[in-house]
Amino acid sequence: MHLLTLLLVMLFALVIAYFCYSVYFYGGRWVANPYNPRISSQKQHVIMGTLTDRDGTVLAYTDEDGQRRYNNSADTRKAVCQVVGDSGGKVSTGADTFHAQFLLGFRSSIFERLADAFTGTTQRGDDVRLTISERLSRYISEQFPKGKRGAVVVLNYKTNEILAMVSMPQFDPTNMDAALANESAGALINRATQGLYPPGSTFKIVTMASALENLPDLNDFAFDCTGYYPVGNYSVTDGSAHGVQSLSDAFAHSCNTTFAALSQDLGYEMLGQTAEEMGFNENFMFSDLIVYNSSYPIDDLSAEDLAWSAIGQGRVLATPLHMALIASTIANRGVMNEPRLIAQVTTAQGGNRALLSHAGGRRVISEDVANRLESEMIRVVKSGTGKPAA
């Protein structure tokens, strides 16, 4: 009986500990739910803090009448619209809603609140400085092909700060009626973090990494690309016949048939393991932003499914931000870090609010493999399929 009581007490303690852990690390997600009645209540009593870019350009602020206002430039408002969000919380992943824990003063200490009450001062939320650059975001928006949908992510690979995260189409947060009337266009969705797409040839980075990690004697690798590779009842095709080429040549030419053949040597277990080490099938719980989970099929794939997955097709899905993280990992010598969107949080009194520490970087591939991939990716841009981007 005493043993049973002890076990029940221990289980109860574990539940309480997990609850406290969840509130501390993920409480911001609960606060950020646009249906949380505490948000609307808090807005009635708290002056919402200011959002700025990394250089201090004001992106959103609260005026003297308590109304949420946005940057005076329509071009700027649209360039950062999905990152900043809107006053009504229609873009629930935007900073105005997702970081309500700071902007609406949920993180204010009891002493700060008592000081406001004692002086009769209306409580003011924290100011949040984001890592993005308004100028860079606006430049990307101006260069983006008109009428096209897509996303662009720019990361500082050393710090994993998000310097720009632009999604098309866009909306103006000062005219939400128009945005909601055209909601089917998808402007309220941040395609960089919420859009799940077949990564295509960018996934060849993962396949190449898996091959370099697991297959021997790749220095002598040669494959004769005839323009198609029969596998099962299907053929993986290429735009042209590349002829006999090394692995480096195949990567530079983005040769589908070579990577389809590599997949058969790797098998679904080895390729799937590398994909998962690089974040596929992971439940992303980042501190600064919501990112939808990428997926790679890990069940017993058929030969043709495996071949298509090796070139980023089939059932492989990823967000643009995740693929940018993978590229950043290569530049960072094989270590993947959590993306950062918050640069600083400042209290109403001018002090720095303590932020949750970001998860430490984890090694996903060896440094030697990362260095080799970096060289190969540079070659792609200098003389391969990426040359037009140079």
Feature locations, PLM:
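Periplasmic/cell-envelope proteins involved in peptidoglycan metabolism and beta-lactam response
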Residues: 1-180, 187, 196, 221, ...
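Beta-lactam-recognizing serine transpeptidase/beta-lactamase-like catalytic domain environment
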Residues: 55, 115-116, 158-201, 206-390
